[in-house]
Amino acid sequence: MKRESFRSRLGFLLVSAGCAIGIGNVWRFPYIAGKNGGGYFVLFYLLCLLVMGVPVLTMELAVGRASRRSAVLSYKTLEKPGQKWHIHGWFCLLGCYLLMMYYTTVSGWMVSYFGKFLTGAFHSGMSTDEVASAFGAMLSSPGEMALWAEVVVVAGFLVCSFGLQKGLERVTKVMMLCLLVLILVLAVHSLTLSGAAEGMKFYLVPSMDSIRENGFGSLVTDAMNQAFFTLSLGIAAMEIFGSYMSDEHTLPGEAVRICALDTFVALMAGTIIFPACFTFGVAPEEGPALIFQTLPPVFINMAGGRFWGALFFLFMIFASFSTVLAVFENILAICMDTFGISRRKAVLINGILIAALSLPCVFGYNIWSDFRPILGKDVLDSEDFLVSNLLLPIGSLVYLLFCVMKWGWGFDKYLAEVNKGTGIKLSPKLKPYFQWVLPILIVIILLQGLL
């Protein structure tokens, strides 16, 4: 069977960026940037992206493009006879399932809140406490949460059932272009608010006071972690798109473009959030509390609040759903390649499977609220711990070692693949850095997540 491929370079870039752009761009990046000295953090974050994120991203893409296969078979195609690197491909599949077990639930929250603003369930007559308490009410309702999570699952697999070009690429291109327009409209509106200057000063103006208060170590570790995790590396979510791309352009250039889009959205998210928070005297937070408890009352209290709230959550739906589609495609590709089944059959099997696997996260906030499977964490945080603290860093280390060590694919073959085509090329002089320094940095991130 002929390998599917992207219709255009723009399709590849937007789908890959859509995989990277997710909820963390909005509920984590702006907060830690403001906390860690604003502009200083952004500069250090960009440096970490270049020295860590871009190299590992090129490795996932290179394995995919050289093999023209998904996770398991890509290793089998490139590894030497008798080697077992392909075992990691199964852990990539496990990581994708685990990620979707909670990401579909959180994406469902976005859909629910979009509906609340659109239908007027949130309106200007409500008190701040009433709006903020709606989040707890939603979490305590397994029926409401399950409904929206399953809507996300069905919609995601429906799109993917149409194939790469007619499904994933076509829908993601429209979503990502709408996302970029929405984020610009929301950012421009936030900059017209009375607290815009104060909010942007906290967010981006370099501040040594913040660094002294939180410590330089906090800046370094937060920048490293954010640069690493924002790209969702280590579970083959990017590798699959390498297998669909052409040989016309070098991988370092494409990786830089993907990172630039991801960073643009993260920076613009802060431009939306901080002026609004400072205008209405609300302390910026991070995580779900920011999106579902801090910001909705802010929108309700501003002129045209229902409209701006609905636009914001539509933007959040696009950000989260682009990741859902990308990971669903990876799951389907692994199943189709490895087991030789049709796309339609893979969609049916995995749709039912992920619909069922999403329920523990839903129930973890209500009927299973006492269930704390890992280190006293609830179900969602336990699933996220396994993905973010174990599978992503360990998986990235495996891809790195496979690409640069002679007992893997080998640095020379990796270098030839990444430099194929026109664009930015990697120098062979980077070999010592890739073989010795970069693995140590990834191990540091792994240990930070476990300690």
Placement of each model-derived feature along the sequence:
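Membrane-water interface regions at transmembrane-helix termini and the short interhelical loops
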Residues: I32-N36, K84-M100, G136-S140, V151-M175, ...
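Membrane-interface "cap" regions at the ends of multi-pass membrane proteins
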Residues: M1-W27, V56-L61, R65-I87, S246-T250, ...
